[in-house]
């Protein structure tokens, strides 16, 4: 957690330079660097091990943080899709396989989200891209797309 956005962005850039995912989000006036998403503690712990192998020791908080989202409609559908994809992408980033059925289910759920907001339409495209990343075993790319979506819909 950083008091300035510039400090947080510097850390996020360093993380991305090593091939990982990261995004900065303002929460309660401070800037937090998110470096991965997972549905369960075991998933984020496995992501943490990968960070440690790249000399990011002790930076991963491993905390479960909540983030409020603000969308024009269907907030519950957004949250459900992000949660499901965070699980699938963390599994893929950790070298585990994901079934085609799980990916198809996630894609179908995303396609059910309706919005007329242009920004949200672009974010829905990123969610579909994240599902495609998972399908192609590109877990960190999927994580980055999910973090970008979270940045776009988080309420400050």
Regions found by a protein language model. Give the residues of each.
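Weak global preference for isoleucine
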Residues: 1, 15, 27, 69, ...
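Short charge-dense sequence patches
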Residues: 1-2, 98-103, 138
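Stable alpha-helical elements in mature extracytoplasmic
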Residues: 7, 11, 47, 102, ...
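Structured segments of extracytoplasmic/periplasmic soluble domains
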Residues: 11-14, 18, 50-54, 109, ...
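Short, solvent-exposed coil/turn linker segments
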Residues: 14-17, 99, 135
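Extended amphipathic alpha-helical interaction segments
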Residues: 60-110
């Amino acid at each position: 957690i950083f008091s300035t956005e510039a400090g947080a962005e510097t850390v996020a850039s360093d993380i991305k330079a090593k091939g990982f995912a990261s995004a900065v989000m303002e929460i309660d006036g401070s800037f937090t660097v998110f470096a991965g998403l997972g549905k369960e503690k075991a998933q984020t712990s496995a992501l943490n091990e990968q960070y440690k192998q790249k000399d990011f020791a002790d930076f991963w908080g491993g905390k479960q943080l909540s983030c409020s989202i603000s969308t024009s409609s269907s907030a519950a559908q957004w949250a459900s899709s992000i949660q499901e994809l965070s699980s699938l992408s963390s599994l893929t980033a950790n070298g585990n396989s994901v079934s085609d059925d799980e990916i198809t289910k996630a894609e179908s759920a995303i396609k059910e989200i309706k919005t007329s907001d242009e920004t949200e339409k672009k974010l829905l495209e990123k969610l579909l891209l994240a599902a495609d990343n998972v399908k192609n075993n590109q877990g960190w790319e999927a994580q980055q797309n999910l973090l970008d979506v979270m940045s776009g819909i988080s309420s400050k």
